[in-house]
């Protein structure tokens, strides 16, 4: 729960920063100057709108997200059409990557993309509303397909756009190939999209904080998460360079969520997905899941071991010794997940057997 909360708050901050950046551009288009006080007000206002949706929870989210999805799909279609019109389909880099450099870029890109879906692993806050009769394969299949198709389409359009404009600053770059009348709509769509995404993230973060054991209402937990995310966003936008912050954060987050996911998935496999739901939600020392002082020691050791292994392989904010020895190749994701899975299988069998259903 702690790991899930940390990941959710980090993504809340990153998404909020993206929405705020688009909102700053909207403010500038009105003739106002986006001074630091104005930026702070914009960030807080977007966070307040997001948290209002999260506080009301699942019911409001379900009602709002169909019309939001349709509106965003329309905006995305216009952007996609503009990208296809301007893309250079004959583009070839001046110096194609080969050998170790090619693999280093491929692994870094995979790690960056994987950070998104992996971050949702411990946030099954909507699947819990599905009936028990829902086929597990169907749930997994449709979830994977729903994540895979948009990722491929969006990533492909991003790559095509990079053949026409400098995508180191995607928001400003795309405005150069969009019709002038559509630019404000594009910016509003960016804000709306990130607000809708963050409402889900804040909802999950609030539940994760409650799952840690704090006796607070979901409203209080969501507001606390929002305050933490706003603080991180202010740092990312007003102190650090935004794109560097996003890139580094997404890749460093993998150091945590890779091992976290591995422990979670390995536990599911060892138990064959059979859990005593009542006992699992019992947070008292009498619960079979209380383990040692409330800590599953094998799980904690496996997590820390995986994080340590991943940290040695990082090549983002710093270059770990393993990454350095491999010519800059970042293997933090596979290394962290593999080490955590092996450690948990080796150390956790007794704990799993003691709490088996």
Features from the language model and the residues they span:
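Transmembrane alpha-helical segments of multi-pass small-molecule transport proteins
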Residues: 1, 29-56, 70-81, 113-121, ...
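Hydrophobic transmembrane alpha-helices that form the core helical bundles
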Residues: 1-32, 194-211
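Hydrophobic, membrane-embedded alpha-helices of multi-pass small-molecule transporters
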Residues: 80-86, 95-161, 180-199, 291-310
């Amino acid at each position: 729960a702690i790991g899930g909360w940390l990941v959710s708050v980090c993504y809340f901050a990153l998404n909020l920063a993206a929405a705020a950046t688009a909102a700053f551009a909207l403010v500038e288009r009105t003739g106002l100057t986006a001074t630091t006080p104005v930026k702070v007000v914009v960030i807080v206002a977007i966070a307040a709108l997001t948290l209002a949706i999260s506080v009301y929870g699942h019911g409001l989210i379900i009602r709002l997200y169909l019309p939001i999805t349709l509106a965003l799909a329309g905006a995305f279609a216009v952007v996609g059409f503009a990208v296809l019109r301007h893309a250079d389909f004959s583009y070839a880099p001046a110096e194609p990557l080969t050998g170790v450099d090619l693999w280093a870029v491929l692994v870094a890109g995979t790690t960056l993309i994987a950070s998104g879906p992996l971050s949702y692993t411990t946030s099954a806050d909507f699947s819990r509303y599905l009936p028990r009769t829902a086929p597990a394969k169907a749930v997994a299949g449709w979830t994977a397909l729903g994540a895979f198709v948009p990722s491929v389409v969006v990533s492909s359009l991003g790559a095509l756009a990079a053949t026409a404009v400098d995508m180191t600053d995607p928001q400003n770059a795309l405005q150069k190939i969009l019709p002038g009348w559509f630019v404000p709509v594009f910016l509003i769509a960016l804000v709306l999209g990130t607000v809708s995404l963050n409402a889900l993230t804040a909802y999950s973060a609030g539940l994760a904080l409650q799952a840690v054991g704090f006796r607070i209402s979901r409203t209080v937990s969501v507001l606390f998460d929002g305050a933490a995310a706003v603080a991180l966003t202010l740092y990312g936008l007003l102190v650090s360079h935004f794109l560097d912050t996003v890139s580094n954060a997404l890749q460093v987050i993998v150091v945590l969520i890779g091992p976290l996911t591995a422990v979670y998935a390995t536990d599911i496999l060892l138990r064959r997905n059979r859990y005593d739901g009542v006992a699992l939600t019992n947070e008292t020392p009498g619960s079979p899941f209380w383990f040692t002082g409330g800590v599953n020691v094998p799980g904690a050791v496996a997590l820390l071991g995986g994080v340590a292994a991943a940290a040695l392989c990082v090549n983002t904010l710093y270059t770990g010794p393993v990454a350095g020895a491999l010519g800059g190749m970042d293997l933090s994701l596979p290394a962290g997940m593999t080490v955590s899975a092996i450690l948990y299988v080796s150390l956790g069998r007794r704990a799993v057997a003691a709490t088996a259903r």
